Design a protein with these regions (language model features):
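Loop-to-transmembrane helix entry
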Residues: 2-26, 47, 78-81, 158-165
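Hydrophobic core of transmembrane alpha-helices in multi-pass small-molecule transporters
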Residues: 69-94
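Multi-pass alpha-helical transporter architecture, strongest
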Residues: 61-63, 157-185
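Intracellular juxtamembrane helix-capping segments at the cytosolic ends
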Residues: 4, 92-107
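Helix-to-loop junctions at the C-terminal end of transmembrane segments
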Residues: 27-47
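C-terminal ends and interior cores of transmembrane alpha-helices
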Residues: 50-72
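Loop-to-transmembrane helix entry/capping segments in MFS-fold secondary transporters
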Residues: 11-12, 77-78, 103-121, 160
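A membrane-interface helix-boundary motif in multi-pass transporters
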Residues: 135-171
Length: 185
């Protein structure tokens, strides 16, 4: 929310933007699951994992365009919504098959333990993700109240889109790591 409000202005509605993800998942998960039914869980997950960096790169494009793509809506908002749509589609490929994949990795009788540990990534990513996001936000998109003029803040936040490059890189590394893991196991 801070990125959107700082870059798109106080009139931005990050709460509304956050509703895009569940809406897209609700509308698309059954369709994607049906399409991927004959494919392996790892194939479906890999497709989703490679969509994640695409999502981040779309979000980075928000302040690249000179004029508004849609009249009356900030490009930051438009590209954020497009990025969230792609991220939600990635979730449609990953989530339905994620627990299936972990249960198939488990030795007989230890499925519950493996399924429990399958959520460890959520814990770790929330800690590291929020920490990294805070550091990057401070570096590339600082709070405007810390500056004497709007021009000084604009100069300090000129590269705010770099934040998304970091997350695209992390997503790409994770996607290749999953491919490598699938080949090894």
């Amino acid at each position: 929310p801070k990125y959107v409000i700082r870059m798109a202005g106080e009139t931005a509605k990050p709460g509304w933007i956050a509703n895009v993800n569940p809406f897209v998942v609700f509308c698309c998960v059954s369709f994607v699951t049906r399409i991927m039914a004959k494919r392996s869980a790892i194939t479906s997950m890999n497709i989703g994992m490679f969509l994640i960096p695409v999502s981040a790169m779309l979000m980075a494009c928000g302040n690249i365009f000179e004029s508004e793509l849609i009249t009356g809506i900030s490009n930051i908002t438009v590209m954020m919504i497009l990025g969230i749509v792609v991220q939600a589609l990635a979730e449609c490929f990953i989530s339905p098959r994620y627990l299936e994949y972990f249960s198939l990795q488990a030795p007989k009788g230890e499925e519950g333990l493996y399924l429990g540990f399958s959520h460890l990534h959520s814990f770790l990513s929330s800690i590291f993700g929020f920490g990294i996001a805070g550091v990057l936000l401070t570096k590339y998109c600082p709070d405007p109240v810390l500056f004497e003029t709007h021009e000084a803040w604009q100069a300090a936040s000129a590269n705010a889109h770099y934040i998304w490059y970091y997350f695209a890189a992390i997503g790409l590394v994770a996607a290749f790591a999953l491919l490598l893991f699938a080949k090894i196991t």
